[in-house]
Amino acid sequence: MAISATTQSALVGGSQDDIILSTSAPIPQRLEDDQVAVAVKAIALNPVDTKMLGDFHTPGAVLGCEFSGVITSAGPVATSEWGLREGDRVSGAIMGMNPLRPQIGAFAQHTVAPAHVVLKVREDWDFAQGAGMGNAWYTSGWALFHTMGLPAGPQLEPLHTLVPPPPGNAGKLPSTNKPITVLVSGGSSSTGTTAVQLLKLAGYHVIATCSARNFDLARQYGADEVFDHSSPTCAADIRERTRNALRFALDCITTPETTRLCYAALGRSGGRYVSLDPFSEAVAATRGVVRPDWVLGPELVGEDIAWPEPHGRKGNPKARVFCEAWTRTLQRLVDQGLVKTHPQLVRDTGLKGALGGLDDIRAKKVSGQKLVYLL
């Protein structure tokens, strides 16, 4: 399915530290052996997309990390190792606003993605649902089953067999017949509902925090217990409920307030705190028995990241190995109907509408839903 055009419409970095709709962005022409080219049919917005300004901003670079569409061309490795072929309906999680690959991003009519971050979309899913199987699923898996060091368990094959958690990350897990409890702060966010589902599949007991209006949402995705994050006694209530023994907390929001809540909820002997953004060092310093860390989803691609510190880093081969196993795991979960996407607010206003969607996210007008735009 050759693409004769050389330019396209895309959301790109503007010259005034802003995001603009360009109608003359170049279509990526070079396809590497392990990549696929995709005609984009739907895109999903994330809070990170609103942060690609200032030092993260590259004029002309395409924005966006989540998409779904139809493969127009596949490299030989993408076909031989991943079974991806022209005409396949797929979703992907890539790094937008990438100064090293400025022509590649999700918010465009055409994009390119490495095969190891691409999933085939189920036949009974539309493109909007497909666009929801991206960033959150990769980031939460990396955070829980690598950085936090939780064993994935046999329910999450082949990850469980291929990539065991690094030794020492979680410390010695308690030998008990009761499920280990994990706190998910921001349990009604996109990454939150994803993390809750994965933890339940892996056999954990999940406590979620969110606003009271989203309690039912968190429960629908599997949370065993839900607490109101705005309650002044939230952390104390969780600590009492867990008998002062909670050891694991995933912070899907990552503000000083949510870090403080997680730290206060963790038990007397401390434990592991993992966030999705750099956390407050001042808060982290308040409890030496808690080991904090944070994750950067694009690291899973395995390539150098040229964003400003502390986000910039060399390519991580171990992250790519994890990602390859995790993609095979996610594909099985999708195919078997074991996971569902976050609730979606679908709009058919295309890339132009997505500009307004970024403003809605900045203004916190969207809660408990993922914004998806059809192209």
From Swiss-Prot:
Sequence positions that bind substrate: N135, A136, W137, Y138, T139, S140, G141, W142, G297, P298, E299, L300, V301
Gene Ontology MF terms in the entry: nucleotide binding; oxidoreductase activity, acting on NAD(P)H
Family annotation (InterPro entries): ADH-like_C, ADH-like_N, GroES-like_sf, NAD(P)-bd_dom_sf, PKS_ER, Trans-enoyl_RdTase-like
Keyword match Aminoacyl-tRNA synthetase: no
Enzyme type, top EC level: oxidoreductase
This protein's UniProt keywords: NADP, Nucleotide-binding, Oxidoreductase
Residues binding NADP(+), per UniProt: 48-51, 188-191, 211-214, 276-277, 366-367
Pathway listed: Secondary metabolite biosynthesis
EC number per UniProt: 1.-.-.-
Domain of life: Eukaryota
Catalytic activity: (2S,4S)-4-hydroxy-4-methylglutamate + 8 malonyl-CoA + 3 S-adenosyl-L-methionine + ATP + 8 NADPH + 11 H(+) = (2S)-3-[(2S)-3,5-dioxo-4-[(2E,4R,6R,8E,10E,12E)-4,6,12-trimethyltetradeca-2,8,10,12-tetraenoyl]pyrrolidin-2-yl]-2-hydroxy-2-methylpropanoate + AMP + 3 S-adenosyl-L-homocysteine + 8 CO2 + diphosphate + 8 NADP(+) + 8 CoA + 6 H2O
Keyword match Ribonucleoprotein: no
Function: Trans-enoyl reductase; part of the gene cluster that mediates the biosynthesis of the tetramic acid Sch210972, a potential anti-HIV fungal natural product that contains a decalin core. The PKS module of cghG together with the enoylreductase cghC catalyze the formation of the polyketide unit which is then conjugated to 4-hydroxyl-4-methyl glutamate (HMG) by the condensation domain of the cghG NRPS module.
Subunit relationships: Monomer.
Family: Belongs to the zinc-containing alcohol dehydrogenase family.
Protein name: Trans-enoyl reductase cghC
